[in-house]
């Protein structure tokens, strides 16, 4: 199997302008994902899909190849799946050979060193058309109905360790067959939920405060 990485990174963040090129621990945010991909020998190509000139320049200097993302796939209402479909079709039209795409989100810059190797190992077994990473949630969740809180995954007074396990997508990485991405599907019918038991799974950058937290985590777990 041949694996490539695509990192989608549009330039129009409204909550945090310039987020993808903002320095995290001395390196532009997007470069953390580029370097993670380039460091893995299983990856035969690392691409950044973007509409922003500054992201193109920084990503190219970091060693990634650039896919120009049209405006129709870069607006506020454009989905990651539509951008990935465009990128995959672009590469196919160029004659690039690959079977699976590793999707790395620039806003999830911290990943355990061996996570991608382990994920590819799961895909190589041939039982799953895709894979995505999840964290276990320890939160007691519920709904507010008619002014009253109604527990959803627990009962009042229940200990956290007695709750039924629930999980959420952490965005660290996705692996998907190219045929699914051409249908704008990232998680296919046999997608494997890979549980991440590492604090990096909690880092998702959307605000300045998230950057501060990520820098703390880098220094706290720099050897992992």
Residue ranges and their predicted role:
Residues 29-45, 57:
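A short, N-terminal amphipathic alpha-helix
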Residues 53-102, 114, 118:
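Short phosphate-binding loop-to-helix
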Residues 195, 200-224:
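Hydrophobic helical membrane-anchoring modules
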Residues 43, 96-98, 127-128:
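Short, high-confidence coil segments that cap the C-terminus of an alpha-helix
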Residues 1-17:
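N-terminal nucleotide-binding beta1-loop-alpha1 segment
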Residues 42-47, 200-202:
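Short active-site oxyanion
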Residues 56, 178-182, 211:
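A generic structural signal for short hydrophobic patches within well-formed alpha-helices
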Residues 82, 109-199:
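Conserved core of the sugar-phosphate nucleotidyltransferase
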């Amino acid at each position: 199997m041949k694996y490539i990485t695509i990192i989608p990174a549009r330039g129009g963040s409204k909550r945090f302008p310039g987020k993808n090129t903002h320095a995290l621990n001395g390196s532009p945010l997007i470069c953390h994902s580029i370097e993670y991909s380039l460091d893995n020998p299983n990856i035969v190509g690392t691409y950044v899909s973007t509409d922003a000139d500054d992201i193109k320049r920084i990503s190219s200097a970091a060693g990634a190849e650039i896919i120009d993302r049209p405006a129709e796939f870069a607006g506020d209402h454009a989905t990651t799946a539509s951008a990935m479909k465009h990128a995959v079709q672009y590469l196919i039209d160029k004659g690039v050979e690959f079977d699976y795409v590793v999707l790395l989100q620039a806003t999830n810059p911290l990943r355990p060193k061996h996570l991608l190797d382990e994920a590819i190992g799961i895909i190589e077994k041939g039982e799953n058309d895709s894979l995505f990473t999840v964290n276990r949630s320890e939160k007691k969740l519920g709904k507010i109905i008619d002014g009253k809180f109604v527990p959803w995954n627990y009962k009042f007074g229940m200990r956290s360790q007695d709750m039924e396990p629930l999980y959420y997508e952490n965005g660290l990485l996705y692996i998907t067959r190219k045929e699914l991405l051409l249908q704008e599907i990232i998680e296919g019918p046999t997608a494997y939920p890979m549980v991440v038991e590492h604090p990096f799974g909690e880092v998702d950058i959307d605000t300045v405060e998230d950057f501060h937290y990520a820098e703390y985590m880098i220094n706290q777990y720099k050897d992992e």
